[in-house]
């Protein structure tokens, strides 16, 4: 997961510092794949990369083709859902990024998705708790304003096996008990048809701590702070985000060149 975080973070530096966004979705997919290929332990994608910009980002299981392959516009959000198969395991990560100032509404929606992501990450797993119970926490902030998303909050992930692997998941209809050692995704989102998509995804590991189960993050990559409305986050959420970014910097910084390190430091600074 650290190796995958290095590839994704180097890609994010590359795309964020381009002088001209002369790119299409398929070029983005190939470029990210090239960054992963630089690692000798990388074997192949764990699934077809989703790179959806603007309205294509609102298609939950989007796959680009010759007809849909959209140019990247600096005024649109870009949703990138990707993963790799490495000798040491399987990754799956989603980041949503922007290239210019965004509206207050988009910031609000992104922050509500982030609040859901943090709610799952901070969740204590009670005895015999099932995925259905955790799923509610992820949707709470969106539900407060009458919004939701049409997919599960998380799916099980195998170890150099299937990137979607049961029986565990975090979803409305899953009643499988969450147990120590399971890996699941944490990926709430929001999608406005024909406009944009937002998703934040990390993989998490269920660990035992003082006779309690909790989630430990496995994914290390910056979350775009330009999309966050800080005043919507409570103190615990701000602390979680700052601690997460501190850990991202600690895990990845030694693999960055000088220019990449400058952006990583800024991306991981406190809000």
PLM regions with names:
Residues 1-271:
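Active-site neighborhoods and metal-handling regions in enzymes and metal-associated proteins
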């Amino acid at each position: 997961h650290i190796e995958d975080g290095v590839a994704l973070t180097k890609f994010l530096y590359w795309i964020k510092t381009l002088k001209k966004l002369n790119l299409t979705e398929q070029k983005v997919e190939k470029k990210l794949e090239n960054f992963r290929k630089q690692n000798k332990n990388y074997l192949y994608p764990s699934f077809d990369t989703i790179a959806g910009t603007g309205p294509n980002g609102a298609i939950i299981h989007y796959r680009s083709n010759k007809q849909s392959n959209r140019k990247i516009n600096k005024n649109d959000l870009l949703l990138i859902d990707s993963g790799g198969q490495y000798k040491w395991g399987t990754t799956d990560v989603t980041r949503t990024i922007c290239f210019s100032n965004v509206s207050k509404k988009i910031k609000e929606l992104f922050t509500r998705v982030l609040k859901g992501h943090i709610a799952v990450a901070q969740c204590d797993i009670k005895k015999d708790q099932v995925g259905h119970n955790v799923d509610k926490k992820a949707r709470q902030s969106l539900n407060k304003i009458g919004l939701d998303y049409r997919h599960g909050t998380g799916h099980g992930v195998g170890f150099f096996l299937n990137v979607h692997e049961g029986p565990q998941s975090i979803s409305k209809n899953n009643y499988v008990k969450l147990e120590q050692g399971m890996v699941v995704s944490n990926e709430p989102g929001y999608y406005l048809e024909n406009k944009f998509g937002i998703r934040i995804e990390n993989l998490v590991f269920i660990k035992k701590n003082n006779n309690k189960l909790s989630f430990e993050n496995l994914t290390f990559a910056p979350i775009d702070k330009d999309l966050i409305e800080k005043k919507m986050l409570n103190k615990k959420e701000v602390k979680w985000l700052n601690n997460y970014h501190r850990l991202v910097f600690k895990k990845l910084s030694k693999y960055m060149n000088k220019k990449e390190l400058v952006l990583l430091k800024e991306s991981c600074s406190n809000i």
